[in-house]
Amino acid sequence: MTAKITIAALQEMKREGRKIVGVVAWDTPMAQIADRAGVDIVSVGDSVGKNLWGHATENEVTLDELLIVCQAVRRGAVRALVSCDIPSGSLSDAKRLVDEGGAQMVKVLAPAPAVRAIAAAGIPVFAEFHGGRPTAELVDEAKRLEEAGAALLDFRHSGPDAGAAVVKAVRIPVIGGLGGGPWLDGRMRMAHAAIGYGTQWLDSQAETYAHVGSIALGALSAYAEDVRAGRQIKGQRG
């Protein structure tokens, strides 16, 4: 196994021009698979509520629920660095995610003062901010977050021009989730979306790296046919 990923290792990757690979995962098996694939960051997102638990929005996920998810992912990700979202952005919640959840970094959508408070407590911060504004304004915000102590930036909806400008303006890695691109220091993608796992991909022509949902549907349909026909099911003895 290669060396454990650290904040310092991620920052060195930026200096050397090596792209950082991130995925969002919510359970131990997916974290284990991501680890074996060589992913650098496994992020536990509050997106678990809408994409895995069937909630209407991500706002229904509580901190206590995220703690359980973070613990599960941490058990699976041995090499990759594990980050976890903070629903509130508060220092007390950040401490719980680290102390109880096992997070090695916390991701927060909050202004520089909140980032500074968390970073000052010795907790690495993955600071999220969004595009759709003048490039100069985005560069200034990125610099403020870096100065406040952010270890990484998650720049959503960056666009190539603003994204490239922010990457050049700060020393810390700039990762792109939604609306990112190759102009950033790395990318973040939901593992379920990358492999096409979920009912939303069963009837979709969206491009993915696999169609695991369709494979699962076919496999479970075949299993149901075997049971109803009185045949021995695959993988079970006795």
Segments from the language model and where they lie:
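Alpha/beta enzyme core
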Residues: 2-238
